[in-house]
Amino acid sequence: MAHERAGQVALPEDLINVDALIGAYYDLVPDPDNPDQQVVFGTSGHRGSSLDVAFNDAHIAATTQAIVEYRAGQGVDGPLFIGKDTHGLSGPAWKTAIEVLHAHGVDIRAERDEDFTPTPSVSRAIIVYNRDHAGPRADGIVVTPSHNPPRDGGFKYNPPHGG
Protein backbone atom coordinates (compact mmCIF):
# COMPACT_ATOMS: atom_id res chain seq x y z
CA MET A 1 0.00 0.00 0.00
CA ALA A 2 1.39 3.39 -1.01
CA HIS A 3 1.91 6.16 1.51
CA GLU A 4 -0.97 8.65 1.58
CA ARG A 5 1.36 11.43 0.33
CA ALA A 6 3.22 9.36 -2.27
CA GLY A 7 4.04 11.43 -5.35
CA GLN A 8 3.39 14.76 -3.63
CA VAL A 9 5.82 17.57 -2.90
CA ALA A 10 7.57 17.22 0.46
CA LEU A 11 6.28 19.35 3.31
CA PRO A 12 8.67 21.61 5.27
CA GLU A 13 8.65 19.19 8.22
CA ASP A 14 9.82 16.41 5.88
CA LEU A 15 12.99 18.25 4.90
CA ILE A 16 16.35 17.85 6.60
CA ASN A 17 19.10 20.38 7.19
CA VAL A 18 21.88 18.87 5.08
CA ASP A 19 24.45 21.41 6.32
CA ALA A 20 23.74 20.42 9.95
CA LEU A 21 23.95 16.75 8.99
CA ILE A 22 27.35 17.22 7.31
CA GLY A 23 28.59 19.45 10.14
CA ALA A 24 27.71 16.75 12.68
CA TYR A 25 29.45 14.14 10.50
CA TYR A 26 32.76 15.99 10.89
CA ASP A 27 32.32 17.69 14.29
CA LEU A 28 30.71 15.10 16.57
CA VAL A 29 33.01 12.38 17.89
CA PRO A 30 31.49 9.04 18.89
CA ASP A 31 31.95 7.69 22.41
CA PRO A 32 33.34 4.15 21.99
CA ASP A 33 31.75 3.13 25.31
CA ASN A 34 28.25 4.13 24.18
CA PRO A 35 26.61 1.19 22.34
CA ASP A 36 24.33 3.59 20.42
CA GLN A 37 27.41 5.27 18.95
CA GLN A 38 29.31 2.13 17.97
CA VAL A 39 29.57 0.70 14.46
CA VAL A 40 27.08 -2.10 13.92
CA PHE A 41 28.10 -3.79 10.69
CA GLY A 42 25.32 -6.22 9.74
CA THR A 43 24.57 -8.02 6.50
CA SER A 44 23.82 -4.71 4.79
CA GLY A 45 26.68 -2.79 6.37
CA HIS A 46 26.49 0.08 8.87
CA ARG A 47 23.71 2.65 8.98
CA GLY A 48 22.94 5.59 11.22
CA SER A 49 22.74 9.36 11.45
CA SER A 50 25.50 11.82 12.23
CA LEU A 51 22.99 13.75 14.33
CA ASP A 52 22.81 10.72 16.66
CA VAL A 53 26.62 10.33 16.54
CA ALA A 54 26.02 6.95 14.88
CA PHE A 55 27.47 7.69 11.41
CA ASN A 56 30.44 10.03 11.55
CA ASP A 57 33.89 10.53 10.07
CA ALA A 58 35.50 8.35 12.75
CA HIS A 59 33.05 5.50 12.04
CA ILE A 60 33.76 5.50 8.32
CA ALA A 61 37.53 5.88 8.71
CA ALA A 62 37.62 2.93 11.14
CA THR A 63 35.29 0.80 9.00
CA THR A 64 37.31 1.50 5.86
CA GLN A 65 40.51 0.62 7.74
CA ALA A 66 38.88 -2.66 8.78
CA ILE A 67 37.95 -3.34 5.14
CA VAL A 68 41.56 -2.70 4.07
CA GLU A 69 42.76 -5.19 6.69
CA TYR A 70 40.05 -7.71 5.77
CA ARG A 71 40.98 -7.49 2.08
CA ALA A 72 44.63 -8.18 2.94
CA GLY A 73 43.66 -11.15 5.08
CA GLN A 74 41.48 -12.58 2.31
CA GLY A 75 44.04 -12.02 -0.43
CA VAL A 76 41.81 -9.51 -2.23
CA ASP A 77 44.30 -7.15 -3.83
CA GLY A 78 42.58 -6.11 -7.05
CA PRO A 79 40.72 -2.86 -7.58
CA LEU A 80 38.05 -1.68 -5.18
CA PHE A 81 34.96 -0.25 -6.87
CA ILE A 82 33.29 2.46 -4.78
CA GLY A 83 29.96 4.18 -5.34
CA LYS A 84 27.60 6.50 -3.51
CA ASP A 85 24.00 7.62 -3.67
CA THR A 86 22.31 11.00 -3.20
CA HIS A 87 21.75 10.91 0.58
CA GLY A 88 23.25 13.91 2.39
CA LEU A 89 25.91 11.89 4.23
CA SER A 90 27.00 9.84 1.23
CA GLY A 91 29.39 12.44 -0.19
CA PRO A 92 31.32 13.06 3.04
CA ALA A 93 31.51 9.33 3.86
CA TRP A 94 32.65 8.57 0.30
CA LYS A 95 35.48 11.11 0.68
CA THR A 96 36.55 9.67 4.04
CA ALA A 97 36.66 6.17 2.55
CA ILE A 98 38.65 7.37 -0.49
CA GLU A 99 41.22 9.02 1.81
CA VAL A 100 41.76 5.83 3.84
CA LEU A 101 41.88 3.60 0.75
CA HIS A 102 44.32 5.95 -0.99
CA ALA A 103 46.57 6.06 2.10
CA HIS A 104 46.87 2.26 1.84
CA GLY A 105 47.59 2.25 -1.89
CA VAL A 106 44.32 0.56 -2.85
CA ASP A 107 43.51 0.72 -6.59
CA ILE A 108 40.25 2.71 -6.37
CA ARG A 109 37.67 2.68 -9.17
CA ALA A 110 34.98 5.37 -8.89
CA GLU A 111 32.48 7.13 -11.12
CA ARG A 112 34.00 9.99 -13.07
CA ASP A 113 33.36 13.44 -11.61
CA GLU A 114 32.31 11.92 -8.26
CA ASP A 115 28.89 11.16 -9.75
CA PHE A 116 26.29 8.91 -8.15
CA THR A 117 26.46 5.14 -8.63
CA PRO A 118 23.61 2.74 -7.83
CA THR A 119 24.41 -0.35 -5.78
CA PRO A 120 23.69 -2.78 -8.66
CA SER A 121 26.24 -0.96 -10.84
CA VAL A 122 28.99 -1.47 -8.27
CA SER A 123 28.01 -5.13 -7.85
CA ARG A 124 28.02 -5.67 -11.61
CA ALA A 125 31.40 -3.94 -12.02
CA ILE A 126 32.90 -6.31 -9.43
CA ILE A 127 31.38 -9.39 -11.06
CA VAL A 128 32.42 -8.42 -14.59
CA TYR A 129 35.94 -7.49 -13.51
CA ASN A 130 36.45 -10.77 -11.67
CA ARG A 131 34.97 -12.74 -14.56
CA ASP A 132 37.21 -11.08 -17.14
CA HIS A 133 40.49 -10.95 -15.17
CA ALA A 134 42.47 -13.97 -14.04
CA GLY A 135 44.63 -11.91 -11.68
CA PRO A 136 43.81 -10.18 -8.40
CA ARG A 137 40.15 -10.13 -7.38
CA ALA A 138 38.08 -6.96 -7.08
CA ASP A 139 35.57 -6.00 -4.40
CA GLY A 140 33.72 -2.82 -3.50
CA ILE A 141 32.09 -0.36 -1.16
CA VAL A 142 28.72 1.32 -1.63
CA VAL A 143 27.97 4.42 0.42
CA THR A 144 24.18 4.30 0.81
CA PRO A 145 21.60 3.75 3.52
CA SER A 146 19.35 2.38 0.76
CA HIS A 147 15.72 2.98 1.72
CA ASN A 148 16.49 4.55 5.11
CA PRO A 149 15.39 8.15 5.83
CA PRO A 150 17.27 11.12 4.34
CA ARG A 151 19.02 11.90 7.66
CA ASP A 152 20.75 8.51 7.61
CA GLY A 153 24.02 7.39 6.09
CA GLY A 154 24.99 3.88 5.11
CA PHE A 155 28.20 2.03 4.30
CA LYS A 156 28.24 -1.43 2.70
CA TYR A 157 31.06 -3.77 1.73
CA ASN A 158 30.65 -5.87 -1.42
CA PRO A 159 33.01 -8.89 -1.48
CA PRO A 160 34.45 -10.38 -4.68
CA HIS A 161 31.19 -12.20 -5.50
CA GLY A 162 29.58 -8.77 -5.91
CA GLY A 163 27.09 -8.70 -3.12
Each model region followed by its residue ranges:
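Metal-dependent DNA phosphodiester-chemistry modules and their immediately adjacent helices/loops
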Residues: 150-163
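Phosphate-binding chemistry for phosphorylated carbohydrates and sugar-nucleotides
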Residues: 12-15, 20, 24-27, 107-116, ...
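An N-terminal, well-structured beta->alpha segment
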Residues: 2-99, 134
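N-terminal small/polar loop signature for handling phosphorylated ligands or for N-terminal nucleophile
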Residues: 73-76, 81-151
